[in-house]
Regions:
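Short helices/loops that flank or line small-molecule/ion binding pockets
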Residues: 113-127, 140-144, 209, 213, ...
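A structural signal for short loop-to-beta-strand junctions that line the ligand-binding cleft
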Residues: 59, 124-133, 148-190, 218
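N-terminal secretory signal peptides
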Residues: 1-20, 31-38
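Bacterial lipoprotein signal-peptidase II cleavage site
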Residues: 42-51
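Early extracytoplasmic/lumenal segment of secretory-pathway proteins
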Residues: 55, 61-139, 274
Length: 284
């Protein structure tokens, strides 16, 4: 369990040291907001970042090349269980003629950022056009000059299909650099049949059920502390968009207790999906 404790400690320190205020971290778009950001190949901009980012060393070929390289999380696109095809993505390719390289290579925000950070800071290409990041990480990229402004004049759906409360967010006023994708919620996931066989119901409705002793060692929580801590604070009756340090530490103590007693099997990024598929984990 020490590995899980260490991960929680690292993520918590990163959370508390974030340049964003607590209110901005968990506001408006919801606990689990995720934004699709147009990667700018490290191009610097007037973003107020502490260190100026070198100018991009790669050429924008979007006018001449009908290709799109997209990095995202596992499970963020509708997929045919039998064939592995992605109907929505296939329809987009057919309609536009754009060749899409769709890569599920984001398991954790910090992990992915560490992989491409040096290239971004040096103004080099990361070989992606579109990256799906949680709101707080999208904010860091935008503020650091790593994102490219969107041309809304050729994106009518950017306004037509986005609800009003997500049209204008604190980290990206006017949505100049990002658009919401799978945004505005933090959820539980579980294996219905296995859950019912252990606790008598196939539905999870509260955190209390996750801590049922019959699920000991079969529960995973996300390494994305903004999701995990937000849900725990709400469970404890506190507002995850406006909380005190004492309330935050109360939630941390609850998490540590459940890790130390073995109730929580692991703290993971989106790699939890493999444990769900194998049956090692029943709920996340």
């Amino acid at each position: 369990m020490s590995e899980n404790r260490d991960l929680v400690a690292r993520e918590t320190v990163a959370f508390m040291r974030s340049a964003l205020s607590r209110r901005r971290i968990l506001q408006a778009a919801g606990i689990g907001g995720v934004a699709a950001v147009a990667a700018a190949c490290g191009a610097g901009g007037d973003t107020g970042s502490a260190t100026a980012t070198p100018a991009a060393t790669t050429q924008d070929l979007s006018d001449s090349e009908k290709t799109l390289s997209w990095s995202t999380w596992p499970g963020y696109m509708d997929t045919d269980d039998k064939t592995g095809a992605r109907p929505s993505l296939d329809a987009f390719v057919k309609q536009t003629g754009i060749d899409v390289t769709y890569t599920e290579d984001i398991n954790d925000n910090n992990e992915f950022y560490a992989k491409v950070r040096t290239q971004l800071e040096q103004g080099q290409s990361i070989d992606r056009d579109l990256v799906v990041l949680t709101d707080w990480m999208a904010a860091l990229w935008i503020e650091s000059g790593y994102a490219q402004k969107l041309d809304k004049s050729i994106m009518p759906n950017a306004s037509a299909n986005v609800i009003d409360k997500l049209q204008n967010v604190a980290f990206d006023p006017g949505r100049e650099y990002s658009l919401p994708w799978q945004s505005g919620f933090g959820l539980f996931g579980w294996n219905k049949s296995k859950l019912k066989s252990l606790i008598g119901t196939d539905t999870l409705t509260s955190v209390d059920q996750l801590f049922n002793p019959k699920l000991k060692g079969r529960v995973t929580v996300l390494s994305e502390m903004r999701d995990t801590m937000g849900i725990l604070m709400a469970w404890q009756g506190n507002d995850p968009s406006n909380f005190t340090e004492a309330q935050f530490m109360q939630a941390i103590d609850a998490l540590r207790t459940q890790i130390d007693n073995g109730q929580i099997r692991s703290v993971e990024g989106n790699s939890y999906m493999s444990d769900m598929e194998s049956g090692n984990v029943i709920a996340v």
